Regions:
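Asp-based, Mg2+/Mn2+-dependent phosphohydrolase catalytic module
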Residues: 84-87, 100-187
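Helix-loop "lid/cap" segments that line or gate small-molecule binding pockets
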Residues: 15-16, 35-50, 107, 139-140
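A short, Lys/Arg-enriched amphipathic alpha-helix followed by its capping loop at the start of a domain
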Residues: 14-19, 81-91
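Asp-based phosphoryl-transfer active-site loop
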Residues: 1-6
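Conserved phosphoryl-transfer catalytic core
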Residues: 8-29
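Metal-dependent phosphoesterase signature
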Residues: 22-27, 42-81, 89
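Short beta->alpha linker loops
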Residues: 7, 31-35, 59, 74-78, ...
Length: 187
């Protein structure tokens, strides 16, 4: 729904430069659709003891908070058109995001699309986040629908894996990450 990835690329380039490890924006592709704990793990694997994890997190959120204090969340083209269509035809709509609840709700409100959603599921609301299917299964349960009757729009590998494993019909939304031939055949 949102192009938050481009903001994180800038943030992690800034953080990496400040901490002396060099631009780290490339890590966004490696962590797309993953919750904070998995993202931290990926950073540990990549950089080991080269930087303080708490400092990376603090600086990242400082950069992100400053960005959003001065800019609206970037909305992907066509989002409101799709949401208007779905609501106009009385579809029930859920968000299933790996991001924390406070971040998701702030972005939905900032983009003035919070009113479209019947259910909001976030990475900090489930025991296992994407690529595990839990978030989609829980969203479908709250919508009172079997996952086989739900469509999932995804732009990350971990999100696609989660949606497919849950039994949702899955639609790939091209973004920074591009699926390989095996993943393309599944969606």
């Amino acid at each position: 729904m949102f192009d938050t990835e481009s903001v994180f690329v800038k943030a992690w380039d800034y953080v990496g430069d400040r901490l002396g490890i060099g631009p780290a924006g490339f890590m966004v592709i490696e962590t797309l659709g993953m919750n904070l704990e998995v993202t931290k793990q990926k950073w540990r694997e990549r950089f080991g003891g080269k930087c303080d994890e708490a400092e990376v997190e603090r600086m990242t959120y400082e950069y992100i908070d400053d960005y959003y204090a001065n800019n609206h969340v970037p909305v992907k083209k066509g989002l409101k058109t799709i949401l208007d269509y779905l609501k106009g035809h009385r579809y029930r709509i859920a968000v299933a995001s790996s991001s924390p609840e406070n971040v998701v709700k702030a972005h939905l409100k900032d983009a003035d699309i919070d009113k479209y959603f019947d259910v909001i599921m976030c990475g900090d609301m489930v025991a296992k986040s994407k690529p595990e299917p839990d978030i989609y299964i829980e969203a479908a349960t709250k919508l009172k629908l079997p996952t086989s009757e739900c469509y999932a729009f995804e732009d990350s590998e971990s999100g696609l894996k989660a949606a497919l494993a849950s039994g949702c019909r899955t639609i790939m939304v091209p973004d920074l990450w591009q699926p390989d031939d095996v993943m393309r055949q599944k969606v």
